[in-house]
Swiss-Prot record:
Family according to the record: Belongs to the 'phage' integrase family. XerD subfamily.
Origin: domain of life: Bacteria
InterPro entries: CB, DNA_brk_join_enz, Integrase-like_cat_sf, Integrase_catalytic, Integrase_recombinase_N, Integrase_SAM-like_N, Recomb_XerC, Recomb_XerD
A Gene Ontology term for the protein's cellular component: cytoplasm
Any GO BP: DNA transposition
General function of this protein: Site-specific tyrosine recombinase, which acts by catalyzing the cutting and rejoining of the recombining DNA molecules. The XerC-XerD complex is essential to convert dimers of the bacterial chromosome into monomers to permit their segregation at cell division. It also contributes to the segregational stability of plasmids.
Chief localisation class: cytoplasm
MF annotations from Gene Ontology: DNA binding; tyrosine-based site-specific recombinase activity
Protein name in UniProt: Tyrosine recombinase XerD
Length: 297
């Protein structure tokens, strides 16, 4: 059965590759679509029978469904990894995905906040335990550029305030050390000393750094709800995503002369080309500023 090979592949990704739940979910979604297409087209005997033409048919179906270039590219990547696994495990000697080209993605510059907008967002009135937590969270995000998944995965033991850094685990469980500024340190100390113990209440075995009103680890959805509320309070009309502060962190560093390699290291990017997108953001902002303020623009 075709399904068994896919289940073995997921086990390999989880145990041997140590991929995160989010990444595993993406693989599962992509390969479930792929398997269903093959079943719908009577390709259910063995993976040996799958051809390049079959895969191209699947990709054309995705295109006809209006899927984005990025989504199609991700499916291709998942399919390639799966067929390489089949060869590695000697389930098949045929790799029909070998010469399938990935479509070129349209470069979409990430949305960022201006320095003034960041300042407005971070002007949180700390009149409740939860607002003290929110202030500490956003100050930490803007100070470090952490991914939201990294933020909510932090434990208290990952925070090293005396030494001025936070220890986090990014994609593929790769560890990195990110420095903290004095402002973020101050509000984290305030949160830990004044709010966290009250929030965890009787759930004092909770290791999570950031917890919800029930004393349990904050979820991604919970963080997103908080961020949307704070954005409205700050009167920011831009469309904000959970990664907006990460994008703003990187762009503001580069605008102020930071070295690209250092920004890459702080963001935890494996490939510097991923970080280079932020240099395009700074150039676009510079062009906009020129057009707005130069008398002969």
């Amino acid at each position: 059965m075709l399904e068994y090979a896919i289940e073995d592949f997921f086990h390999f990704l989880r145990i041997e590759r140590g991929l995160s739940d989010n990444t595993l979910s993406s693989y599962k979604r992509d390969l479930t679509n792929y398997l269903q297409y093959m079943k719908d087209h009577d390709k259910t005997a063995t993976w040996d029978k799958i051809s390049r033409t079959d895969i191209m048919g699947f990709l054309y179906m995705l295109k006809d469904q209006g899927k984005s270039t990025a989504t199609i590219s991700r499916h291709i990547s998942s399919i390639r990894s799966f067929h390489q696994f089949l060869i590695r495990e000697q389930i098949t000697s045929n790799d029909p995905s070998l010469h399938i080209e990935t479509p070129k993605k349209d470069r979409k510059l990430p949305d960022i906040l201006s320095q003034d907008e960041v300042d407005r967002l971070l002007e949180i009135k700390m009149n409740t335990k939860l607002s003290v937590r929110n202030k500490a969270m956003l100050e930490l995000l803007y100070a470090t550029g952490l991914r939201v998944s990294e933020l909510i995965s932090l434990n208290v033991s990952d925070l090293h305030l005396m030494m001025g850094f936070v220890q986090c685990f990014g994609k593929g469980s790769k560890e990195r050390i990110v420095p903290l500024g004095d402002t973020a340190k101050h509000y984290l100390e305030k949160y830990i000393s004044e709010a966290r113990d009250s929030l965890i209440k009787k759930n004092n075995r909770e290791d999570a750094l950031f917890v919800n009103q029930h004393g349990r680890r904050l979820t991604r959805q919970g963080f997103w709800k908080i961020l949307k509320g704070l954005t409205l309070e700050a009167g920011i009309l831009k469309t904000i995503t959970p990664h907006t502060l990460r994008h703003s962190f990187a762009t503001h560093l580069l605008e102020n002369g930071a070295d690209l390699r250092l920004v890459q290291e702080m963001l935890g990017h494996a490939d510097i080309s991923t970080t280079q997108v932020y240099t395009h953001v700074t150039k676009a902002r510079l062009k906009d500023m020129y057009q707005s303020y130069h008398p002969r623009a």
